[in-house]
Amino acid sequence: MSLKQSMENKDIALIDILDVILDKGVAIKGDLIISIAGVDLVYLDLRVLISSVETLVQAKEGNHKPITSEQFDKQKEELMDATGQPSKWTNPLGS
């Protein structure tokens, strides 16, 4: 059985697709030109990068060894301690 046939009969959830996209990353580039009577009125150069923060950090460091969420959180805490800046994502109510 080919890969295509095996995938046709398999239910794939949206969360599975998002998991793969965030793990590997996706780059999308496109151009949008709006013109009337052959005159270009609007030109948009679109570039979108969808990835998790962990994937981007690994790519920037050139580190291909996987980093766990716990290691990433530890590095984030060390960086916040070094800079003296509190995390803007913490809940001020403490819950």
Swiss-Prot record:
Keywords of this entry: Gas vesicle
InterPro entries: Gas-vesicle_GvpA-like, GvpA, GvpA-like_CS
PROSITE patterns named among the record's database cross-references: GAS_VESICLE_A_1 (PS00234)
Main subcellular location: other
MF GO annotations: structural molecule activity
Signal peptide: none
Domain of life, source organism: Bacteria
Compartments, record wording: Gas vesicle
Classification via PANTHER family: GAS VESICLE PROTEIN A1, GAS VESICLE STRUCTURAL PROTEIN 2-RELATED
Family: Belongs to the gas vesicle GvpA family.
Physiological role: Probably a minor component of the gas vesicle. It is not clear what function gas vesicles perform in soil bacteria. When a minimal gvp locus (gvpA2-gvpR-gvpN-gvpF-gvpG-gvpL-gvpS-gvpK-gvpJ-gvpT-gvpU, called pNL29) is expressed in E.coli gas vesicles are made.
Record's protein name: Gas vesicle protein S
